[in-house]
């Protein structure tokens, strides 16, 4: 029966485990628990008296499972009825008999399911059934032991003596006997619930004041097989009494149990005597020692205990009879000889193998039996490993040694072999990696049969000495868009004029403006290299920490298919068009950039680090950037000086410095003079093409203003003036603003977006972009009060008029028809006075 609710009460001390945890160890099994489970499957046959051995197969299935995990099981069976438990056994026997009679009656009535339930409750495990399991287990070399009385006390003794390391059972009484480790509710796969005595302190209900003795007292007070509990006393109240009581005399505590619980409980004298008997039964119940082969009490008797008075805990018999009972040779009820098994003369049984190395273990199977003369209990795993370690590993506190690993071949990870470098990069090669790279696709010349090599000549400034170094960087050709090339050639042959403004920017390739550039710039050029003027600025060209970088780039674009390799800048090349792109550069000292570049398309121009929306001047996509696309409509002037756009950039920079620094007058004067000189030399066609030049906004962290460049007012203006409005720096990254295309800038400004109406279209198809277009800085800017439309403004526009229109007073009496006609807004007030409406009036007033 066990102790009601004990497992739930101490669930904190339980732990789910698998039985393989005890591999190589010995466990004891309460076999009657397996017998009861196995008998349920054949309860109907057992009730009818029909022969069956299904319960034997059920038990052996668990035995084989333990053997397969390398665990040695010892099957323990119940023996004679304990005198202190005769009343309990008699009541159980009467209950089983009543269920058996009821089941037979229900079976006669045809109620099979209800009869089967009654047969299940009437199962009685006899010694004959246990003997069948003993024979089946011995055939496989499994030790079996029949307890002189109860199997619980015998199992507890085996665990305390160290013969077994754990106990497999379904009865919670084992904890009251003082077992150290108990495995409960184990299934056929080996999963179970382990309760360790050392973990009982983890139970919050028990606390840290509980001992093994108090735990046993609690189990007895809550009700056990040897004594029923008082009315209204369970585990919780029994635990509360023992936690509050400090008196070591348990008899006095029981007499004052009503005082501790504040209950009106009268404790009879018979209950106190029954408590003492139950406690002595848990302590001194007789068990069989398989090593000494005699009956002994579970615990040694104390000095004040008389063994003669403990007859209720078991009566002594002769040791030879006790041995025969333990071996299963005698019936526990009649003491008749039913078997002649002798462990000393019996041949070792050969159990079936469970793994490939089981043969080595079968040789010592007889020696490992508990019935062998030389058998000694296996010490616990903790004591085996601790004792030698203390001797072999002395303390190393305060000991210092110098350890050398020179002679040791330590395992290490294989080192990753780096790729050997043929030669280190020079400073010029390193600088060329950070410069703008351009490519030119090689094309086949049908007339000459030779190929022109793609090259890019880059003049890199020397930051130390000052003179420029010329480098030729060869890059692999880039694959062009075949479909775009085909459409371009088709448009050129048909003579169609393609306006870039009417094309979709999503499907426009990098070379889609070649035909336009060929028609615009048709004059030969005398020079293909442009030298920029020196800039006396105090910012670094490479890697300023504030993120400011302005690069001056002059791109010479040749739209022809072939350019000879021996071309000299001074030669005259007919039918060629060259497009230049300007950039500004800052350096620590004065520097010059001279580039002679012949890329196939403008789409291949991109910087080394092209950040999206950042400092890069070229797009990541093959489509041309806005500034590059518009530069193809400009033509180079004959003067060897820089282009006007470069001057525009210089002037803008000088004007931005003019507001903050008053000491830069020489620079401004020099820039303005150069601007006026070069503007005068600008030709008519050059001025027409420069109408579409672009204004690039420069960045800074200190100033904020708008950038607005008004180039020309109308197409008919043939002068080459460049009207420059205020130039300043924004707190946003550098962007290329394209006239006619409104690009979304970064959300760094808190001002609202103001869109001006578009003006008249230009000849190129692109409209001029409004001067000041600002975006909201944050995505949450629409929640600001200044940017929201209030309800009052909406009601002003859509509200109803309060004052209704009143008809002017008249001297004539009102007419119910004439004066109730509401005039429409289109009708005139004197509609009735017109002669052409007289017929209508007569029809109305008649």
UniProtKB/Swiss-Prot annotation:
Changing residue 109 to K: Abrogates exonuclease activity. Residues 382-396, 620-631, 639-654, 672-689, 713-722, 743-754 have a biased composition (Polar residues). Changing residue 419 to A: Complete loss of nuclear localization. Residues 138-229 are annotated as: I-domain. Highly expressed in bone marrow, testis and thymus. Expressed at lower levels in colon, lymph nodes, ovary, placenta, prostate, small intestine, spleen and stomach. GO terms for cellular component: nuclear body; nucleoplasm; nucleus; plasma membrane. InterPro entries: 5-3_exonuclease_C_sf (IPR036279), EXO1_H3TH (IPR037315), HhH2 (IPR008918), PIN-like_dom_sf (IPR029060), PIN-like_EXO1 (IPR044752), XPG-I_dom (IPR006086), XPG/Rad2 (IPR006084), XPG_CS (IPR019974). The modification Phosphoserine is found at residues 376, 422, 454, 598, 610, 623, 639, 660, 674, 714, 746. Residues 129-387 are annotated as: Interaction with MSH3. Residues 372-396, 618-781 are annotated as: Disordered. Mg(2+) 2 binds at residues 171, 173, 225, 270. The modification Phosphothreonine is found at residues 581, 621. Mg(2+) 1 binds at residues 30, 78, 150, 152. Phosphorylated upon DNA damage and in response to agents stalling DNA replication, probably by ATM or ATR. Phosphorylation at Ser-454, Thr-621 and Ser-714 is induced upon DNA-damage caused by treatment with hydroxyurea (HU) but not upon IR treatment. The HU-induced EXO1 triple phosphorylation facilitates destabilization/degradation of the protein. Residues 1-99 are annotated as: N-domain. SMART domains: HhH2 (SM00279), XPGI (SM00484), XPGN (SM00485). It holds the Pfam family XPG_I. Keywords: Acetylation, DNA damage, DNA excision, DNA repair, DNA-binding, Endonuclease, Excision nuclease, Exonuclease, Hydrolase, Immunity, Magnesium, Meiosis, Metal-binding, Nuclease, Nucleus, Phosphoprotein. Belongs to the XPG/RAD2 endonuclease family. EXO1 subfamily. 5'->3' double-stranded DNA exonuclease which may also possess a cryptic 3'->5' double-stranded DNA exonuclease activity. Functions in DNA mismatch repair (MMR) to excise mismatch-containing DNA tracts directed by strand breaks located either 5' or 3' to the mismatch. Also exhibits endonuclease activity against 5'-overhanging flap structures similar to those generated by displacement synthesis when DNA polymerase encounters the 5'-end of a downstream Okazaki fragment. Required for somatic hypermutation (SHM) and class switch recombination (CSR) of immunoglobulin genes. This is Exonuclease 1. It comes from Homo sapiens.
